[in-house]
Each structure stands twice: as C-alpha cells, then as structure tokens.
C-alpha cells in the first residue's frame, strides 16, 4: 500500500469518527509529560472514549469531508482528539476535569452531535450531570407529587385514627 493510500485511509477513518461520534473534543496536549498523557488516555478508555493524535493536515481534510470546516481554525500545533460514539458528555467531562488538574491541557473545540462547539460550550457540557444523573433528577421530580399525595393521605388517616381513639 502506498503512502498516499495510507493517508487517504487515515483521512477516511477520521472523517467517519467525526460523523459517527456523539461527542468529539479537540485538545492541545503541549506541556503534558508521557505519564500525564497516559493517565488521560486511561481515564478516557475506562469511559469508552477513543483518544488519538492525528496530523493536522489529515484532520483538516477529514473535517472537510465530514462538513465540519469550522474545526480547521483550531487545528494548529499539537492536537489530540477524543471521540465517543454513545455518550455526548463523557469526553468533555473527563477532559475538563483533567484540564483543571493539569493546566497544560487546553481544550480547543469540540463537535457535539454533528455541530462544532466552542471551548465555552464544551466546558458547559462538561458541567452537566451524566445521563443517569439527569434521569434520576427527572424521576425524583416526577415522583414528588405522588409522594406528597401519599404523605397527605397518611396524615389524614393518622388524624382520623387519633380522633377515633
């Protein structure tokens, strides 16, 4: 396989990942040592994320194929990309918390469900609770009226019992 064919294959791979992933976070990892990058990779892998370093020229071409040309502005300097196919919050949350601990890691941009997101949007997404947390909040809100009704009927029953005794 020629070098050109290998590069085309890599561009296709990146474009596919950009299109299919729920969430993609582009970071500048300059200043992190090997141990820190390994720790970040480990945390992302445990969450089901893929973290790779690609050449900027290939990533630019893939962004054009995936119709995400807004990404081209941030593809300067050392760039790594975290992808997740199912969870839109996981990569942003992990990278944001890691960036708070290690100031050298800088979030450049993101792609959330096919739309290019700014650094602020990625950080806002990272502050959201997980899907399970959001579902539990929704469930508690839905249960509140039923719980209050049950407590009210129990209070009425207790009051009647006291009056009858």
From Swiss-Prot:
The organism's place on the tree of life at top rank: Bacteria
Q: Which UniProt keywords apply?
A: Ribonucleoprotein, Ribosomal protein, RNA-binding, rRNA-binding
Q: Which GO terms describe its cellular component?
A: large ribosomal subunit
One annotated GO biological process: translation
Which molecular-function annotations from GO does this UniProt entry contain?
large ribosomal subunit rRNA binding; structural constituent of ribosome
- Name the InterPro entries on file: Ribosomal_uL10 (IPR001790), Ribosomal_uL10-like_sf (IPR043141), Ribosomal_uL10_bac (IPR022973), Ribosomal_uL10_bac_type (IPR047865), Ribosomal_uL10_CS_bac (IPR002363)
Q: Do the record's keywords include Ribosomal protein?
A: yes
Q: Which PROSITE patterns match?
A: RIBOSOMAL_L10 (PS01109)
Q: Is RNA-binding included in the keywords of this UniProt record?
A: yes
Give the similarity note: Belongs to the universal ribosomal protein uL10 family.
- HAMAP family from the UniProt entry: Ribosomal_uL10
Q: What does this protein do?
A: Forms part of the ribosomal stalk, playing a central role in the interaction of the ribosome with GTP-bound translation factors.
Q: State the oligomer form and interacting partners.
A: Part of the ribosomal stalk of the 50S ribosomal subunit. The N-terminus interacts with L11 and the large rRNA to form the base of the stalk. The C-terminus forms an elongated spine to which L12 dimers bind in a sequential fashion forming a multimeric L10(L12)X complex.
**Name of the protein in its database record:** Large ribosomal subunit protein uL10
Tell me the gene name.
rplJ
């Amino acid at each position: 396989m020629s070098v050109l064919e290998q590069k085309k294959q890599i561009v296709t791979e990146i474009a596919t990942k950009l299109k299919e992933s729920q969430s993609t976070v582009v970071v500048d990892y300059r200043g992190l040592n090997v141990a820190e990058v390994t720790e970040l990779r480990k945390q992302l892998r445990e969450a089901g994320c893929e973290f790779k370093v690609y050449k900027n020229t290939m990533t630019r071409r893939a962004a054009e194929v995936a119709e995400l040309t807004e990404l081209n502005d941030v593809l300067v300097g050392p760039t790594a990309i975290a992808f997740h196919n199912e969870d839109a919050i996981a990569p942003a949350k992990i990278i944001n918390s890691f960036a708070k601990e290690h100031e050298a890691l800088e979030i450049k941009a993101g792609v959330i469900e096919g739309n290019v997101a700014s650094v602020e949007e990625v950080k806002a997404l990272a502050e959201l609770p997980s899907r399970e947390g959001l579902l539990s909040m929704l469930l508690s809100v839905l249960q509140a009226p039923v719980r209050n009704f049950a407590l009210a009927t129990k209070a009425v029953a207790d009051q009647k019992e006291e009056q009858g005794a």
